[in-house]
């Protein structure tokens, strides 16, 4: 009588090789990314593991297709609707695994921050939430029509080595929006720079920075990377306080030095240290080659006028 066949899979991670059996066996790669013990009910931890294995085997599929039968599909929806299941429980195991991979890696690690928008079509969007208000064209009288999008916003920080190897998430924040009417008029009446950062949605950049450093514990190895939306003076101050680093695409040409010139004015006087060519797409979608000039200098940046007293 022959031995039963088992489908094996190999996975290499930082020089170690691990063998996992198929999802129905005793081990799976997902076991290294979750912590079933954080759930208040052991059955929730077991269901969470089974659900991840099924959805991992059908990435891009709907929940019914990934679950394959009605019993598993119903169990999946019950898990998501369970008030005892929190995002912190779901993510805690992955955060621990990210920290372990960070400690096993060497050298500088990039923490890429950005916001992702998930859009859904629902008969009752109020049960999910709203992400934004968009222009949907004009009516017969030429008036602009607007409608809100149903969905969820996720702001995350992804740890990546300088060789491009992803280590995992270090911070995640989920939210929806509730108010759009009158916000544009409100911006015309107040100076946004005078509003405390704690009262702005953009505080998520600072929250993720704190959470990431708190998880990894080695700020000197981290470089936080963000787009123009992260050009926030409070973020620069927090980065300095936490003894870490950042790379941000500048949106505002801030005052620098003694206040009689800007950052760009000061950098224009710096010699070019090198050139870097990248390929991007123009407004027509055609690929073009762009040459970037590399200049480096330590610059003293002044706070916005509305925040100089704080």
Regions from the language model: what does each represent?
Residues 2-310:
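Conserved, well-structured functional cores that handle cations and Mg-NTP chemistry
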């Amino acid at each position: 009588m022959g031995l039963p066949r088992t489908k094996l899979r190999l996975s290499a991670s930082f020089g170690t090789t691990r063998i996992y059996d198929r999802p129905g066996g005793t081990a799976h790669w997902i076991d290294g990314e979750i912590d079933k013990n954080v759930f208040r009910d052991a059955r929730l931890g077991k269901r969470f593991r089974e659900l991840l294995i099924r959805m991992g085997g059908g990435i891009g599929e709907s929940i019914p297709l990934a679950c394959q039968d009605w019993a598993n599909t119903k169990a999946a929806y019950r898990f998501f609707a369970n008030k005892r299941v929190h995002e912190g429980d779901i993510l805690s195991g992955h955060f621990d695994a990210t920290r372990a991979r960070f400690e096993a890696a060497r050298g500088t690690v990039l923490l890429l921050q950005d916001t992702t928008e998930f859009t859904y079509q629902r008969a009752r969007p109020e049960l999910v939430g709203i992400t934004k208000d968009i222009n949907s064209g004009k009516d017969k009288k030429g008036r602009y029509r607007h409608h809100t999008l149903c969905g969820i916003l996720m702001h995350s920080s992804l740890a990546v080595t300088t060789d491009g190897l992803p280590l995992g998430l270090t911070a995640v924040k989920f939210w929806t929006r509730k108010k759009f009417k009158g916000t544009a008029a409100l911006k015309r009446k107040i100076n946004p720079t005078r509003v405390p950062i704690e009262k702005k949605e953009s505080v998520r950049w600072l929250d993720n920075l704190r959470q990431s450093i708190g998880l990894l514990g080695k700020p000197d190895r981290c470089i936080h990377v963000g787009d123009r939306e992260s050009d926030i003076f409070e973020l620069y101050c927090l980065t300095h306080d936490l003894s870490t680093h950042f790379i941000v695409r500048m949106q505002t040409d801030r005052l620098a030095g003694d206040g009689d010139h800007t950052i760009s004015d000061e950098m224009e006087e710096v010699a070019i240290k090198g050139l870097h060519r990248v390929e991007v797409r123009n407004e027509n979608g055609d690929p073009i080659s762009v040459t970037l000039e590399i200049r480096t200098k330590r610059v003293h940046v002044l706070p916005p006028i509305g925040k100089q007293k704080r």
